[in-house]
From Swiss-Prot:
Function of the protein: Catalyzes the isomerization between 2-isopropylmalate and 3-isopropylmalate, via the formation of 2-isopropylmaleate.
GO biological process terms on file: L-leucine biosynthetic process
Organism of derivation: Mannheimia succiniciproducens (strain KCTC 0769BP / MBEL55E)
Cofactor binding, note field: Binds 1 [4Fe-4S] cluster per subunit.
UniProt-listed PANTHER family: 3-ISOPROPYLMALATE DEHYDRATASE (PTHR43822:SF9), HOMOACONITASE, MITOCHONDRIAL-RELATED (PTHR43822)
EC number of the protein: 4.2.1.33
Gene3D superfamilies to which the protein is assigned, alphabetical: Aconitase, domain 3 (3.30.499.10)
Protein's recorded name: 3-isopropylmalate dehydratase large subunit 1
Residues annotated to bind [4Fe-4S] cluster: C353, C413, C416
A Pfam family per the record: Aconitase
Amino acid sequence: MENAMSKTLYDKHIDSHTIKELDNEGNVLLYIDRTILNEYTSPQAFSGLREENRDVWNKKSILLNVDHVNPTRPVRDANMTDPGGTLQVNYFRENSKLFDIELFDVTDPRQGIEHVVAHEQGLALPGMVIAAGDSHTTTYGAFGAFGFGIGTSEIEHLLATQTLVYKKLKNMRVTLTGKLPFGTTAKDVIMALVAKIGADGATNYAIEFCGEVIDELSVEGRMTICNMAVECGARGAFMAPDEKVYEYIKGTPRAPKGEMWDLAIAEWRKLKSDNDAVFDKEIHMDCSDLEPFVTWGISPDQADVISGEVPDPNLLPEGQKRKDYQAALEYMGLEPGMKFEEIKISHAFIGSCTNGRIEDLREVAKVLKGRKIAQGVRGMIIPGSTQVRARAEAEGLAKIFIDAGFEWRQSGCSMCLAMNEDVLSPGDRCASGTNRNFAGRQGAGSRTHLMSPAMVAAAAVAGHLVDVRKFVEGD
């Protein structure tokens, strides 16, 4: 019988932040420690406050950051070229001044993609509950924080009250065992999981990841997994914090200092599921024989290993899945039985809140050093933040990228989504180190294949999808 006192890591976060239970259906009034907002999902929320003449409850708990619509042109300036983007960013700036909330604007040396900037600044700490107007807020689970995305009306309520009406999720534990083989990454792990359980396999769940694979991964690798957990439907993703996390956070601008650091560490070490905690669902995945993954369709779960081939929908039983596969192949312009390594590309994109960090760029440089991208391929590398960009330049990575023929640009969400200048044309096919491959995600009629950033680099050199293990040496 379950111990009445046993709790999962998710339960501990929710219980410690619950102000009041609202009913018997699992709805609670939840306190939010940190709010991170971008220029795209916040305007209506601020307009609502202004119309009602309300102020923001806790200004110091909020960060405003420009990332979705800003240009990533190599030479940075504060001007937008798109009228809609100009309107959004100017209104963002206006609200920052009106409500006295800190803003990382386009030319701020701390600017970047919100889910990269937050951990650089030490804004995402173990035990926190963090809400943002973006679904990939799950990224912060890599630090033992609970992050989740919210809509515009919720943002307005949160700004005014520091709270949200929240419905509790079910608990899922994903245990990842084995040692990652040569050439595989955290991106391959999460892509394999999404393919295994489906795009809705974790709907209404918070996932806790554990096991040898997680223990061995770097903090930035863990962020990739938590970031893409939302692609299988999860509304939250967790990993218990450990010494790697504490070392990563230590010394960041907003992290606790001195005696407060020691007190924080003592509390953070308690952040783990109880040994006898019961999960609503358990999944085990052995990663010992994992291969690099690619998507072939228009959903993140339509993916397989690079050595595979385009599936035949007619081999599936009649039903919705067969129809989905048929629609995906028609949109992607692919034929059943085609080897993945035969698929030619026109574009290669590396960046995003999933894979735009310094460790990702180091792996890309290993593939590109001494090589050139294929004729006819346009390659773009967008660092996840201005600080990542500076670090990559200091380490000599940027020169490798430029010498290989890639465009080395400024930070922002860029081509992860068609919301700024960086947009594909109809029929363009892109090897992409991002998180979503929906129809039109990178531009109307564009075709996106998700993979690790190193795999993108290899595809850019080859001119087609290819196994990155052919380009790098093992240990």
